[in-house]
């Protein structure tokens, strides 16, 4: 049963324009987690998977409002550096380092697969085994045109060795059968690095797929940031790596209060149907402006990586502040570039916030905004991991980061609806509507759902379960004039079992969601 109450539009515009809070959601805080990865299923954006060191996995069926979790196990052992991706069949893949009882520490890269949304995982397959050489820092991408999976990582002859006879290289492997068999690892870098896990080590290889199946990847090392590509699915690569840019001060640097920090690069390619389709982007951080002024940077290429732009700064604060642990993604529906990073622009000590930035014009300009609902102090004796992460599709954006709270690490995300990012105070730029949290929440019987309409719009309001199955259509394609409206929803009439549900407000290309709990 539903009903409607109309309230006149008084002071709503002011409240709308002042909107700036992004709900923070705790993903998990068991096992001292850090170094998170997250992925939104582009085919079902309410389905998300995440992971963190050393063996944690998380999955959500309601757009990241709530999470289930567990620890992953494998006969190959699990030793962190997680990366998660999803293919077009809905299979989830979890890549990590190994620690087998029958081999050597991190002697291969492991891929474990889930076919039930992350509830259970296979024992896994592996790639890169090469005696006792160490295989480290994997990252993966799925070519969604054919579900081929690509992985890049760093191989150390002997991790931590200072011997000039030991070196580090970038390796590549692929699977064409949904992760069952992996190709023989292939070296794709020409200039080797050392094994000290520092500025002169080659690390940070994040592969991406281009509009026509190209594979692009960059990494950092003794030459700065360099780039390679394959035009035949990884069979062959360029004989000469392309120099992209210097990293003044190196990729391995110090941030006060952080156990270990780096500015390793992240590579992305725009394969949307937007105006910047085919653009390549590389994002990193460095201390070219001094050790007290770490900044986030971006370069781009419009010719498949042949030439690169000069670096542009992503963070828009005055000099003298720290921005670090950046990650980037491209929304392959809109072509928008999204960044997440830690930020101290509002503080003079170690107090830390989490910021995001977005570029809607192909990396020419950036808007920065804070997403953490409170600041935190890190502890230099607590390992924070080596990266944050972010995923986006069709204006649904989910960053993920590590936070220290009362001595305990936790993994957090934020509900970032891109329609709320960059609200202008010019009336012609305001958005058509907003959706408020239901009340009461949790719900025992009846709850009220309110929304505000700023421009006359045609509205649909529905309630779904966490699997995306429709429970009720409360408003079906009805036109509303400017104002505030309240719909009431009778949960008992629909015989809902206790648990999480969500409601969705849609008008044209604008889609808003919120979660509610039925007791």
Which residues make up each language-model segment?
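A glycine-anchored, Pro-Gly-centered beta-turn/N-cap motif
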Residues: 481-485, 497-500
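Extracellular, repeat-based ectodomains that mediate carbohydrate processing or recognition
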Residues: 21-421
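Glycine-centered coil/turn sites that cap beta-strands in beta-rich domains
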Residues: 424-464, 473, 485-495, 506-510
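Sec-dependent signal peptide recognition
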Residues: 2-11
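Edge beta-strands of extracellular beta-sandwich domains
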Residues: 512-517
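Solvent-exposed serine/threonine-rich low-complexity stretches and specific carbohydrate-binding patches
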Residues: 472-480
């Amino acid at each position: 049963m539903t009903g409607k109450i109309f309230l006149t539009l008084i002071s709503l515009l002011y409240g709308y324009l002042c909107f700036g809070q992004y709900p923070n959601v705790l993903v998990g805080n068991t096992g001292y987690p850090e170094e998170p990865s997250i992925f939104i299923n582009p085919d079902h954006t309410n389905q998300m998977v995440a992971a963190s060191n050393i063996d944690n996995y998380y999955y959500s069926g309601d757009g990241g409002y709530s999470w289930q979790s567990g620890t992953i196990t494998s006969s190959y052992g699990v030793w962190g550096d997680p990366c998660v991706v999803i293919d077009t069949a809905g299979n989830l893949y979890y890549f990590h380092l190994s620690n087998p009882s029958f081999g050597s520490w991190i002697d291969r890269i492991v891929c474990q697969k889930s076919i039930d949304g992350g509830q259970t995982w296979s024992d896994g397959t592996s790639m890169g085994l090469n005696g006792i050489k160490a295989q480290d820092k994997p990252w993966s991408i799925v070519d969604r045109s054919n579900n081929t999976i690509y992985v890049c990582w760093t191989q150390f002859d002997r991790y931590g060795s200072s011997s000039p006879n030991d070196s580090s290289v970038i390796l590549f492997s692929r699977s064409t059968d949904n992760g069952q068999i992996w190709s023989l690892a292939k070296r794709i870098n020409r200039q080797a690095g050392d094994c000290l896990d520092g500025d002169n080590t080659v690390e940070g290889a994040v592969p991406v797929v281009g509009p026509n199946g190209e594979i692009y990847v960059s990494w950092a090392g003794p030459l700065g940031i360099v780039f390679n590509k394959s035009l035949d699915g990884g069979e062959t690569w360029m004989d000469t790596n392309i120099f992209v840019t210097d990293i003044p001060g190196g990729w391995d640097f110090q941030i006060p209060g952080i156990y270990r920090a780096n500015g390793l690069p992240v590579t992305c390619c725009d394969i949307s149907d937007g105006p910047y389709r085919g653009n390549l982007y590389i994002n990193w951080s460095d201390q070219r402006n001094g050790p007290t002024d770490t900044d986030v940077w971006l370069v781009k290429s419009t010719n498949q990586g042949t030439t690169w732009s000069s670096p542009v700064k992503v963070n828009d604060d005055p000099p003298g502040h720290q921005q670090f642990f950046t990650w980037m993604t491209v929304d392959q529906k809109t072509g928008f570039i999204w960044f997440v990073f830690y930020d101290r622009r509002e503080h003079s000590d170690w107090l830390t916030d989490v910021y995001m930035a977005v570029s809607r014009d192909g990396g020419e300009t950036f808007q920065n905004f804070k997403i953490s609902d409170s600041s935190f102090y890190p502890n230099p004796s607590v390992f924070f991991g080596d990266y944050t992460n972010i995923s986006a599709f069709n204006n649904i954006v989910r960053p993920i980061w590590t936070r220290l709270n009362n001595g305990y690490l936790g993994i957090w995300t934020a509900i970032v609806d891109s329609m709320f990012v960059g609200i202008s105070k010019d009336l012609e730029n305001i958005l058509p509507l907003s959706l408020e949290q239901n009340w009461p929440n949790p719900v025992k019987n009846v709850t009220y759902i309110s929304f505000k309409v700023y421009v006359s719009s045609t509205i649909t309001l529905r309630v779904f379960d966490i699997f995306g199955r429709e429970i009720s259509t409360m408003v079906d394609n009805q036109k509303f004039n400017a104002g505030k409206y309240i719909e009431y929803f009778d949960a008992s009439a629909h015989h809902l079992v206790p648990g999480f549900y969500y409601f969705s407000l849609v008008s044209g290309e604008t889609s808003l969601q919120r979660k509610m709990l039925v007791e």
